[in-house]
């Protein structure tokens, strides 16, 4: 039996941009992607701390070490610049394997930089 488990989490980053008329996605600083083990085009869940919204989209690689967190397309309506969000990726794995699984969690600073 396979179950979904937490794979990666970028905890409490600040939304730096919201681009409504861009094809949907979230643009994430490449340094944050690398540290969290999230790859381009991966499906992620976004949880907005400020308004309680939860939604899914996919990842676009942003310029490295810029701190960019940009919600694009319709997702831009679910955030405001300055909102704090959590980015979560999940993986499907065997139940027994999942018992031993350790997700990758990162906790960037207030400027979306690695600590």
From Swiss-Prot:
The modification Pyruvic acid (Ser) is found at residue 25. Binds 1 pyruvoyl group covalently per subunit. Its cofactor is pyruvate. The active site is at 25 (schiff-base intermediate with substrate), 58 (proton donor). GO terms for cellular component: cytosol. It catalyses: L-aspartate + H(+) = beta-alanine + CO2. InterPro entries: Asp_de-COase-like_dom_sf (IPR009010), Asp_decarbox (IPR003190). Keywords: Autocatalytic cleavage, Cytoplasm, Decarboxylase, Lyase, Pantothenate biosynthesis, Pyruvate, Schiff base, Zymogen. SUPFAM superfamilies: ADC-like. Pathway: Cofactor biosynthesis; (R)-pantothenate biosynthesis; beta-alanine from L-aspartate: step 1/1. The keyword Lyase applies. It comes from the Bacteria. Its EC number is 4.1.1.11. Substrate binds at residues 57, 73-75. One of its GO terms (biological process) is pantothenate biosynthetic process. Is synthesized initially as an inactive proenzyme, which is activated by self-cleavage at a specific serine bond to produce a beta-subunit with a hydroxyl group at its C-terminus and an alpha-subunit with a pyruvoyl group at its N-terminus. The keyword NADP does not apply. Catalyzes the pyruvoyl-dependent decarboxylation of aspartate to produce beta-alanine. Belongs to the PanD family. Heterooctamer of four alpha and four beta subunits. This is Aspartate 1-decarboxylase. It comes from Cytophaga hutchinsonii (strain ATCC 33406 / DSM 1761 / CIP 103989 / NBRC 15051 / NCIMB 9469 / D465).
């Amino acid at each position: 039996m396979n179950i979904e488990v937490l794979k990666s989490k970028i905890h409490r980053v600040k939304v730096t941009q919201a681009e409504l008329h861009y094809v949907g996605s979230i643009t994430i600083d490449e340094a944050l992607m690398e540290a969290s083990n999230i790859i381009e085009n991966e499906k992620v869940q976004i949880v907005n701390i400020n308004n309680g919204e939860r939604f899914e989209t996919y990842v676009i690689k942003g310029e490295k070490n810029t701190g960019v967190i940009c919600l694009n397309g319709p997702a831009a309506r679910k955030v405001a610049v300055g909102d704090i969000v959590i980015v979560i990726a999940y993986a499907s794995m065997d139940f027994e394997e999942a018992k031993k699984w350790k997700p990758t969690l990162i906790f960037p600073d207030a400027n979306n930089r690695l600590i």
